[in-house]
A protein has these predicted regions:
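Generic structural signal of hydrophobic/aromatic residues within well-ordered alpha-helices
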Residues: 1-4, 67, 185
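Acidic/His metal-coordination segments adjacent to aromatic residues that form catalytic metal sites
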Residues: 17-26, 86-104, 167-197
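Generic surface-pattern signal
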Residues: 4-13, 72, 150, 190
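Aromatic-rich carbohydrate-recognition surfaces in CAZymes
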Residues: 32-60, 64-168
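Low-complexity, Ser/Thr/Pro/Gly-enriched N-terminal "stalk/linker" regions
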Residues: 1-37, 62
């Protein structure tokens, strides 16, 4: 019974953004970074209660707003900092930015924000989350999915890390294993953050 309030007390950080919209940063466990998939899963149980608690509803809208802002910073990233702080993975051989905690391309990182936004809208009827930021994020998601079908080459994403763990880096000069472009979307990393093989 304590996990519902504990999650809100220890991992959810709500504020109003510079644009006046709700902005909720959700820490993933003990790491002060926000994984797109994990943050969506962490707040998922609260969606069913959104209509009975206006503050909870606003917090959820803030998570969705933040997720789509993150996607617009980099749709290939899986985890983000709370601002341009840099971090331990800045030396990864990929297009790192100071807003990124980690840049491991995982298809679920783009699917979970869509799932959360849809369920929030379906439950609350609140369409305010579907604004210009959302339109840009959807455009970036669709572009990324198309790029990673790899019908027109390997796409812009590459990733390499100096590590002793084989599944923490990507083979083939950071492009991953060759694939036959049949229309499926290549996900370079699994939800576990391990490279696909």
């Amino acid at each position: 019974t304590n996990c519902f309030p504990n999650t809100l007390d220890t991992t959810v950080h709500f504020r109003k953004g510079k644009d006046g919209k709700p902005d909720t940063f959700v820490y993933t466990g003990d790491i002060h970074a926000m994984w797109l998939r994990d943050s969506g899963a962490q707040v998922w149980p609260y969606v069913q209660l959104a209509n009975s608690d206006p503050e909870l509803k606003t917090m959820l809208a803030g998570v969705i707003n933040r997720q789509f802002k993150c996607i617009n910073i980099d749709p290939y990233a899986n985890a983000f900092n709370d601002g341009p702080k840099g971090g331990e993975w800045m030396s990864d051989l990929t297009d790192m930015k100071p807003e990124l905690h980690e840049r491991k391309w995982e298809i679920d990182s783009l699917c979970y924000p869509l799932r959360l936004a849809y369920q929030y809208w379906k439950t609350t009827g609140d369409a305010s989350i579907f604004d210009e930021e959302w339109i840009q994020a959807i455009t970036n998601i669709l572009r990324t999915f198309k790029e990673q079908q790899r019908k027109d080459g390997v796409g812009p994403y590459k990733f390499q890390r100096k590590t002793e763990r084989a599944l923490d880096t990507v083979t083939n000069d950071g492009l991953g294993n060759p694939v036959k472009p049949v229309g499926l979307i290549v996900s370079t990393f699994r939800p576990s953050d391990d490279a696909t093989t």
